[in-house]
């Protein structure tokens, strides 16, 4: 008889949620984790960055409160205390996961996992000792790690993992290589605190994978905050320049150099499955990611993979949804989440949240569309908060009238995009989504204005 019915490798959002769901459905479960419960998300990603952004927003709002009668003197940011706060939040949430495991009678096996065969996992402790476990099924949820391309001198730059370890002082200046989600959130954090920030992006705009207007609007807002932005810029090398680091790059066929006390490499992440399989044991790969079928099964029978290690979309909530769907199918339960509808958020100011297709993506697929848009200059909550130019765009199929996409750039966009995702998952038409009464004053009432514009264009 096997030791467990399911062994999950990795206690990040995909792994721990899958384990809890499997235990609830009656499986005997173990989770292997070599670091803190919660994985990258809780300890080196989503939660630490949002904690830092929460702290920097308090500083920014207090420092800039004179226009509404709030006057502060001698306000300063203590970086050691900010990072201590970040660690406390992560530790509290990580401890919460371990408590959930105990309640669900899930064994947490501390150590590094090695898959020695289908249904066989060896767990090595830090002291070098190892134990072998057998199981009916294995679920790989080992996530991803920061990428560092082979650019001369880039080893001098920090990754997001290293930056989040903390620093006891505020950098005078920081150069961020990469204008995607990770780079933009760190740019927001450091700009809020008064650090001189430069962002270097290789594509023609910030957030190149998103709607063009989002990146363009964000660049304007960041520049107003004093952030220097270079696009169409290719980094050639990084080198020490006295106490600073110099980043040399080409931009519009010109050689440029910017220097900073620190440099952050934020140009993506790669699937992490290094050393996961014993010699002679392996699975089919899709580039550097583990290849899976429609049920998340790898080429090795009874071995499954979910989340960043196998998915094109590297988001915590995608890993969670995939993990739950995988174990539900293993248990013969109908999974309930539409995995094709994926919201994505960026926690800059104003926030950005998207779901579904952009107008350009729909047209590339040959889908006839109409787009409704509302610029929130007259939205009362936006006028009060004054985060910069905000807007909402909604994309609908021109013939079926169903909503197929949304792009929000406004305060609390991340808290509203779930409702739009619900509309997409249930194939609601623009008229059906417009029926709901939305509160006033609120940021969300701009959704009604965008929907009314969309319905008018649909005719």
Q: What residue ranges belong to the model's regions?
A:
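Flexible, glycine-rich terminal cap/loop adjacent to redox cofactors
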Residues: 7-14, 20-35, 40, 47, ...
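FAD-site-proximal beta/loop scaffold in flavoenzymes
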Residues: 155-170, 257-330
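Gly/Ala-rich phosphate-binding loop of Rossmann-like dinucleotide-binding domains
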Residues: 19, 23, 187, 191-192
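Short hydrophobic core segments
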Residues: 7-9, 113, 132-143, 176-177, ...
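Glycine-rich flavin
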Residues: 2-4, 20-27, 32-171, 198, ...
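Hydrophobic "anchor" residues
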Residues: 48, 121, 271, 298, ...
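Beta1/beta-strand and adjacent pyrophosphate-binding region of the FAD-binding site
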Residues: 1-12, 170-180
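N-terminal Rossmann-fold NAD(P) dinucleotide-binding loop
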Residues: 15, 183-184
């Amino acid at each position: 008889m096997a030791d467990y019915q399911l062994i999950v490798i990795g206690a990040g959002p995909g792994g721990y949620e899958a384990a809890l769901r499997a235990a609830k459905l009656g499986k005997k479960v173990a989770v292997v984790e070599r670091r803190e419960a919660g994985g990258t998300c809780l300890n080196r990603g989503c939660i630490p960055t949002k904690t830092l952004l929460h702290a920097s927003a308090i500083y920014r709002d207090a420092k800039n409160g004179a226009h509404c009668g709030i006057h502060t003197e001698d306000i300063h940011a203590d970086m050691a205390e900010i990072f201590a706060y970040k660690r406390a939040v992560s530790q509290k949430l990580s401890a919460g996961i371990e408590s959930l495991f105990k309640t669900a009678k899930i064994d947490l096996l501390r150590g590094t996992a090695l898959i020695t065969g289908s249904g066989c996992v060896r767990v090595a402790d830090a002291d070098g000792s190892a134990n072998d476990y057998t199981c009916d099924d294995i679920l790989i949820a080992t996530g991803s790690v920061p990428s560092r391309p082979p650019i001369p001198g880039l080893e001098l730059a920090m990754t997001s993992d290293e930056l989040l370890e903390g620093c006891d002082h505020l950098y005078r200046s920081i150069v961020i290589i990469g204008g995607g989600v990770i780079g933009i959130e760190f740019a927001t954090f450091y700009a809020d605190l008064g650090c001189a920030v430069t962002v270097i992006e290789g594509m023609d705009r910030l957030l190149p994978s998103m709607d063009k207007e989002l990146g363009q609007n964000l660049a304007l807002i960041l520049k107003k905050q004093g952030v220097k932005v270079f696009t169409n810029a290719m980094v050639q090398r990084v080198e020490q320049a006295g106490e600073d680091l110099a980043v040399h790059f080409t931009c519009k066929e010109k050689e440029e150099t910017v220097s900073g006390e620190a440099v952050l490499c934020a140009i993506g992440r790669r699937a992490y499955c290094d050393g996961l399989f014993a010699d002679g044991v392996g699975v089919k790969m899709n580039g550097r990611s583990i290849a899976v079928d429609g049920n998340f099964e790898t080429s090795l029978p009874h071995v499954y993979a979910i989340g960043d290690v196998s998915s094109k979309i590297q988001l915590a909530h995608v890993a969670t949804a995939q993990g739950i769907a995988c174990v539900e199918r293993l248990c013969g339960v109908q999974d309930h989440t539409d995995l094709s509808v994926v919201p994505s958020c960026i926690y800059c100011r104003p926030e950005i949240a998207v779901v579904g297709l952009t107008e350009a993506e729909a047209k590339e697929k040959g889908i006839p569309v109409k787009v409704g848009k509302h610029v929130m200059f007259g939205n009362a909550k936006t006028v009060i908060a004054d985060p910069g130019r905000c807007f909402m765009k909604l994309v609908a199929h021109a013939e079926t009238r169903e909503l197929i996409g949304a792009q929000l750039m406004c305060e609390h966009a991340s808290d509203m995009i779930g409702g739009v995702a619900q509309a997409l998952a249930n194939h609601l038409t623009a008229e059906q989504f417009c029926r709901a009464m939305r509160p006033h004053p609120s940021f969300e009432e701009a959704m009604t204005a965008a929907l009314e514009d969309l319905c008018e264009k649909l005719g």
